[in-house]
């Protein structure tokens, strides 16, 4: 007995030691040499990209004044067959200069939220050179696009070296860039002059629009960031060196094969290092930087990142870089929920039980952007759906694979989630509601958004020209998610994953367009998808199919009437349910109605169109089925419950003042 007791104590003590060690915070240190990587990218992937814009940035940041002093050396290489005597630049930070830029006109900046680049010098070929601004649509207040005029053409293979010396004050955060009030936390993105994209003899370099993202070429980055000694820096890429002096530290980051660089600076954050082992045995370092008040979320953040890495490796493709960095931002920061190569920002509510799928969905969504558009770098200004739509679709797949999806919930007092359905609320007090665990069906969140904007704009429309933020959001996020889910259900899940894997392998480190994906899908599945993209990509037709009648026309003969009530077309399945079996037919004709004839000796119960819900854009699934004998008990049950809710609501409202 004594031996058993002693052994039990030993095991408990050992377990406590293991748990304690596991909970210990990590120290953010340089990663050191690794034979599997070169400057942050797997050796195997170095040949997958062509460096076009390479940057060497030396940064000094003063957290007190929020001032960045930067020396930048950019080497741009003409990898095209076309000559150019200009180099265009994005000056995204100038979007915060005043309230008349395309970006700031939406946000109405105050004085603490404004900033702009202040150049001390711009050098080309050891000579000073001037920036020339290009004002889109005559907006002289928007200086987010500029170019330098070269004295001669750069031909294929030629390069140009431009050196910038400038300063930039980090503003109070409004969106994506800035410091958090009340905390020594600054997130710095879109902060340096960055070359546009030269394609087919033209420069693509658009202004910074309020809710759109970016477009730039791949290259190699070397960045040194000097901060006071008590501060820490996390960034795109691998930390290769940390130098300290009496009062300051310099963090050196290298990263090959990316098209942007972002970083944060803070003196109060929890760091946890995790690792993910690929199937080939190589290791990805997961850097988790979490606010002290959200320490309890570290494990959920970690699991979400690892699940995402595993899903991509198993289904689409390897994450090719040495590290991935998650940054949990303060509550007062407006930079959460954004992605950059190798780093992304998240946050979490004070109350976020597991069933809400927050912050899991946010983490998975932002990680997925590492592939779309971190690696498959489409033009987000023109075709935002290629990254936002694909990301929304894949993030939802990951959530349902690893977590089973979330439960329906509503919030009391804005922040406290309650599982169930809320039908009526008065001053944040639920009046008509039900408390029940209901799994949210896949795609439902996107459907709710899509219903708010059925016909304004198409997915094919140029993103920055869509007339409202809602039409942009629906045609970039929710509708493409539903279209991709419909495509998956039409061609099959396995075929969809093969298609995405091929899309990734063919276009990683490139700038594909929508037609590249559409043509690849047609190439794999044949011309049977022509109608699909015509309906869902080029048009904004509303879909609603219904079964409106079942008639017995003879001995063992039945007719089912199916109707297309709106303009949208889909190739549908028609099924007839009997007490013994289920009979199937196809409806592929583009007609408004069709009568389907069935022969069966069994008792007919009902008929249904699209029983597997392949068409996720059908606006009314309730009319998809038709029963021979009406069933009233469900209606009576719902009606009685509804009357009970109304009675409660009237009693509560009647007691108010």
Task: Place the predicted regions along the sequence by residue.
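N-terminal, polar/Ser/Thr-rich
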Residues: 15-69, 182, 530-531, 535
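A surface-exposed beta-strand-loop module
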Residues: 26, 67, 77, 107-184, ...
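Solvent-exposed beta-hairpin/edge-strand motifs
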Residues: 86-129, 230, 577-582
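Extended, low-hydrophobicity, Ser/Thr/Pro/Gly-biased non-transmembrane segments
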Residues: 112-115, 161-268, 610, 647-656
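Coil residues (strongly favoring Ser/Thr
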Residues: 143, 159, 244, 268, ...
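Beta-strand-rich binding/interaction modules
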Residues: 235, 529-530, 543-545, 550-612
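Extracellular/periplasmic ectodomains of large secreted or surface enzymes and adhesion receptors
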Residues: 549, 605-657
């Amino acid at each position: 007995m004594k031996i058993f007791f002693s052994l039990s104590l030993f095991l408990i003590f050992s377990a406590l030691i293991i748990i304690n060690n596991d909970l210990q915070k990590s120290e953010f240190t340089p990663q050191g040499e690794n034979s599997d990587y070169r400057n942050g990218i797997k050796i195997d992937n170095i040949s997958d990209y062509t460096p076009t814009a390479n940057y060497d940035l030396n940064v000094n940041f003063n957290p007190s004044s929020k001032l960045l002093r930067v020396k930048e050396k950019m080497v741009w290489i003409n990898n095209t067959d076309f000559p150019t005597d200009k180099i265009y630049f994005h000056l995204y930070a100038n979007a915060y200069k005043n309230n008349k830029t395309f970006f700031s006109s939406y946000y109405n900046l105050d004085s603490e939220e404004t900033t702009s680049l202040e150049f001390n010098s711009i050098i080309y070929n050891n000579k000073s050179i001037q920036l020339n601004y290009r004002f889109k649509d005559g907006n002289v207040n928007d200086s987010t696009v500029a170019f330098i005029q070269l004295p001669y053409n750069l031909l294929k293979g030629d390069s140009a070296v431009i050196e910038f010396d400038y300063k930039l004050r980090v503003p109070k955060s409004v969106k994506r860039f800035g410091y958090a009030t009340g905390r020594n936390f600054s997130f710095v993105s879109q902060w340096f002059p960055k070359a546009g994209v030269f394609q087919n003899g033209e420069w693509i370099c658009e202004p910074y629009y309020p809710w759109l993202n970016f477009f730039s070429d791949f290259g190699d980055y070397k960045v040194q960031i000097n901060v006071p000694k008590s501060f820490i820096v996390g960034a795109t890429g691998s930390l290769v060196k940390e130098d300290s002096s009496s009062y300051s530290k310099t963090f050196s980051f290298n990263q090959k094969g990316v098209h942007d660089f972002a970083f944060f600076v803070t003196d109060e954050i929890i760091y946890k290092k995790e690792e993910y082992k690929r199937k080939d045995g190589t290791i990805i370092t997961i850097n988790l930087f979490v606010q002290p008040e959200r320490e309890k979320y570290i494990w959920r953040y970690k699991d979400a990142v690892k699940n995402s890495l595993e899903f991509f490796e198993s289904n689409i493709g390897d994450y090719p870089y040495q590290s991935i960095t998650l940054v949990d931002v303060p509550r007062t920061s407006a930079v959460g929920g954004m992605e950059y190569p190798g780093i992304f920002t998240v946050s979490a509510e004070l109350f976020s039980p597991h069933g809400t799928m927050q912050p899991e969905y946010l983490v998975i969504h932002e990680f997925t952007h590492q592939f779309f558009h971190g690696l498959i770098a489409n033009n987000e200004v023109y075709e935002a759906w290629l990254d936002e739509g694909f990301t929304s679709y894949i993030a939802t797949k990951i959530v349902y694979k690893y977590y089973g999806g979330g439960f329906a919930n509503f919030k009391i007092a804005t922040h406290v989630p309650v599982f169930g359905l809320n039908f009526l609320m008065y001053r944040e007090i639920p009046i008509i509601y039900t408390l029940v665990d209901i799994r949210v069906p896949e795609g439902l969140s996107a459907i709710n958004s899509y219903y708010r904007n059925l016909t304004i704009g198409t997915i094919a429309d140029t993103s920055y020209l869509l007339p409202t933020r809602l039409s942009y959001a629906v045609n970039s996020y929710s509708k493409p998610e539903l279209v991709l889910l419909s495509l998956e259900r039409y061609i099959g899940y396995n075929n969809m994953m093969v298609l995405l894997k091929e899309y990734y392998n063919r276009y990683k480190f490139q700038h594909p367009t929508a037609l590249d994906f559409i043509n690849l899908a047609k190439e794999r599945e044949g011309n049977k998808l022509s109608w699909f993209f015509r309906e869902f990509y080029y048009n904004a037709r509303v879909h609603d199919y219904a079964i409106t009648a079942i008639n017995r026309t003879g001995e063992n003969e039945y007719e089912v009437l199916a109707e297309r009530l709106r303009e949208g077309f889909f190739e549908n399945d028609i099924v007839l349910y009997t007490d013994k079996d289920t009979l199937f037919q196809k409806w592929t004709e583009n007609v408004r109605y069709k009568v389907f004839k069935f022969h069966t000796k069994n008792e007919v119960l009902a008929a249904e169109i699209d029983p597997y819900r392949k068409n996720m854009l059908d606006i009314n699934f309730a009319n998809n089925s038709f029963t021979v004998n009406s069933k009233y008990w469900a209606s009576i049950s719902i009606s009685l419950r509804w009357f009970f809710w109304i009675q409660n609501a009237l009693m509560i409202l009647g007691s108010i003042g």
